[in-house]
Amino acid sequence: MCEKKLNMPVITIDTDGMELYDVGEEKAWLELFRTFAGKGMIDKASERAKPNLDIEKKQGKIGVLGLTPQDISDLQAPKKIREYYQEKEGKEAICYCMGENVCRSTDGLDNHRKAGEVEKNIVVSPAALAAAKYLEKTFGTPYEVTYPIVEELVPDMDYRRKKILIVHQQVIGNAMRAEIRRRCQKVNGDPSVDNNAVITVASWFMMKQELSEEGDISLREEDDYMELIKKEDYDIVFADPMMKRMTEDAYKMAGTGCVADAHETERKRIFIDATHFAVSGKLREEMKKREA
């Protein structure tokens, strides 16, 4: 009825207003591909989907799942990701649901209909993991969970042997952790010395068990966060700028002093902005303008 009245495709998902935004996102991502992507084949004996071998893979095309302003907090991210894969791998990145390739299309669902053609999917938020698994099951498309342009989120400083907390959506948090570890390993020195930082990833939102490391934390209340800061006394905290005052208050309550900004490296405890739109309603572009 709605499709006829609006003259456009309509999908429905069950939401009750009692969950966080990423639960609805997860359902929406999955339903978009279930509805509009070319179908796989069903093995009648097992009644399970098997890869549709009739869909021809187009080498040089990569799908990017999970790009939304709420998760990425950067409206320029699709452009940066497309440039990254073009320059690094000579491949075309298809950024579903966000970016110029969506807005300029005569039909924003064209890329979804051709989703089975990409050679690989990149998952940049936990809410898109279920959709990636569906596409793997339906078309045999492998996926990788990462944030390809993570280097710009991690300032150039000494992270060796530091105790670090990263608060963001899980995939970006994990990518930042991996990038910090990579930088620690690159530092010249005695190979027998462990230069690695101790890094915990936490989030106010979806935390997939399969993407978690031991000690990662799902935050529920502000008190949970403040108790964590007081107890663990982190050297460096990456979090949305809205959380900076809360972080300072927690350190004061613990009697360990205030935190400094990233450029004030002589101070022990450092707070580094890791803007997350779902936390503050602010984009990275807005925060940069305020700092300028």
Give a label for each model feature.
Residues 1-292:
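An N-terminal assembly and electron-transfer interface module characteristic of large anaerobic redox
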